[in-house]
Swiss-Prot record:
Annotated signal peptide: 1-21
Residue span of motif Prevents secretion from ER: 163-166
Induction (record text): Not induced as part of the cellular response to endoplasmic reticulum stress. Up-regulated by androgens and by estrogens in prostate cancer cells Up-regulated by a hormone (estrogen-receptor alpha) independent mechanism in ovarian cancer.
Protein name: Anterior gradient protein 3
Annotated source species: Homo sapiens (Human)
Length: 166
């Protein structure tokens, strides 16, 4: 009798937990296709030209993330970028955001070569800020997961430079 009750209770718990898991999954928004996993709550522009237009119009800096789906370094950076609340909040509210899986015709976005991941900032006057760099001398604009504090600092620097130049 007790075994029968315990079995019934287990079955009930499994049913409730699986229904709860289904309900939680349904609550999640479908991924925004333009985010490509970098942050579904961020409004992403589709093209570099669109990004430049909105940067100039809104007086916000444009942050351009070059990456590839099959690059382990891009994937590792994307994972921590998407999970970092401070980065997501700044990206969502203070930047025009673009992530690209192909190169643009603007050679200013690849001052030291075409590699991924690469993050560049463009100010509202449409100047590529080559002075905002990462920590690696051989790939100035790349960031690794452990470099998030530097990326956050560089995002803040991009915002400060705009304030001081307006």
């Amino acid at each position: 009798m007790m075994l029968h009750s315990a079995l019934g209770l287990c079955l009930l718990l499994v049913t409730v937990s699986s229904n709860l898991a289904i309900a939680i999954k349904k609550e999640k928004r479908p991924p925004q296709t333009l985010s490509r996993g970098w942050g579904d709550d961020i409004t992403w522009v589709q093209t570099y030209e669109e990004g430049l237009f909105y940067a100039q119009k809104s007086k916000k800096p444009l942050m351009v993330i070059h990456h590839l789906e099959d690059c382990q370094y891009s994937q590792a950076l994307k994972k921590v970028f998407a999970q970092n609340e401070e980065i997501q909040e700044m990206a969502q509210n203070k930047f025009i955001m673009l992530n690209l899986m192909h190169e643009t015709t603007d050679k200013n976005l690849s001052p030291d070569g075409q590699y991924v991941p690469r993050i560049m900032f463009v100010d509202p006057s449409l100047t590529v800020r080559a002075d905002i760099a990462g920590r690696y001398s051989n790939r100035l604009y790349t960031y690794e997961p452990r470099d998030l504090p530097l990326l956050i600092e560089n995002m803040k620097k991009a915002l400060r430079l705009i304030q001081s130049e307006l």
